[in-house]
Amino acid sequence: MAEPSAATQSPSVSSSSSGAESSAPGGGSGSPGACPALGTKSCGSSCADSFVSSSSSQPVSLFSTSQVHDLIFWRDVKKTGFVFGTTLIMLLSLAAFSVISVVSYLILALLSVTISFRVYKSVIQAVQKSEEGHPFKAYLDVDITLSSEAFHNYVNAAMVHINRALKLIIRLFLVEDLVDSLKLAVFMWLMTYVGAVFNGITLLILAELLVFSIPIVYEKYKTQIDHYVGIARDQTKSIVEKIQAKLPGIAKKKAE
């Protein structure tokens, strides 16, 4: 008679144990559900640390990568042509005139267009006796205020790049890596010859022409360019390895 009673008690024990397991969902090791077992304080601190680390590793970008990619690859010919033509005219104007003259002429041209259109619409409304109102009212009503959140996002994005640049400058000028510092020295030495031939505006014009032309050429001849770039990279790597092997400090660091 004792066996049936034990048999009747075992389902209750198993159901209670399963109920205890179901009361702690996700209780596996390493799962988020393990937080209740760690306590409220430790769980909150660990969750906060993980949130901070994940958010800090994803900085806000000032520009969308896809938009820049579409712009330099001429996905929208009208938009790219407008940007390319406007910036090229600006740079050519700065090459011929001073910055003050270029800015003044641009403002005068813009004011000439807007004032002429405003006077024209006023005369038309007076002749037709219509009440259309201000011709630029739709644009005047547009909210262009910058929110504090958006401002802080842009500042944070800029600070990421500034801090990265400062670390790189310190690393190069304090010779953390001798080869990288020598590369900078050789590059600056070559730039002295470039600066003797071209001024800053000319270099900007050439840079714009390259930015808006090289991506198209690369997209068209990608296979051939990748082949020759790979050969040049291998040769450069072998030369750098030979130089590093002859430098005692670098060779000792590699051996360690």
Curated annotation (Swiss-Prot):
Q: InterPro entries in the record, alphabetically?
A: Reticulon, RTN1-4
Q: Give the ranges annotated as intramembrane.
A: 88-111, 172-192, 197-217
Q: Does the keyword Transport apply?
A: yes
- In residue numbers, the region (Interaction with BACE1) covers 224-226
The segment annotated Interaction with FADD runs over 211-256
Residue positions, PTM N-acetylalanine: A2
User: What processes does the entry annotate via GO biological process terms?
Assistant: apoptotic process; vesicle-mediated transport
Region of interest called Disordered, as start-end residue ranges on this chain: 1-32
Q: Which UniProt keywords apply?
A: Acetylation, Apoptosis, Endoplasmic reticulum, ER-Golgi transport, Golgi apparatus, Membrane, Phosphoprotein, Transmembrane, Transmembrane helix, Transport
| Record membrane topology | Multi-pass membrane protein
Signal peptide range in chain numbering: none
Q: Where in the cell is it found?
A: Endoplasmic reticulum membrane; Golgi apparatus membrane
Side Cytoplasmic, residues: 2-87, 112-171, 193-196, 218-256
GO CC annotation terms, alphabetical: endoplasmic reticulum; endoplasmic reticulum membrane; Golgi apparatus; Golgi membrane
A Pfam family in this protein? Reticulon
- Coarse class of the primary localization is endoplasmic reticulum
Looking at the record's lineage, which domain of life comes first? Eukaryota
According to the UniProt entry, which residue ranges have a biased composition of type Low complexity? 1-24
Reticulon domain location: 68-256
Q: Which residues carry this modification: Phosphoserine?
A: S31
Task: Explain the purpose of this protein.
Answer: May be involved in membrane trafficking in the early secretory pathway. Inhibits BACE1 activity and amyloid precursor protein processing. May induce caspase-8 cascade and apoptosis. May favor BCL2 translocation to the mitochondria upon endoplasmic reticulum stress. Induces the formation of endoplasmic reticulum tubules. Acts also as an inflammation-resolving regulator by interacting with both TRIM25 and RIGI, subsequently impairing RIGI 'Lys-63'-linked polyubiquitination leading to IRF3 and NF-kappa-B inhibition.
The record describes its quaternary structure and partners as: Homodimer. Interacts with RTN4. Interacts with BACE1, BACE2, BCL2 and FADD. Interacts with ATL1 and ATL2. Interacts with TMEM33. Interacts with ZFYVE27 and with KIF5A in a ZFYVE27-dependent manner. Interacts with RIGI. Interacts with TRIM25.
Record protein name field: Reticulon-3
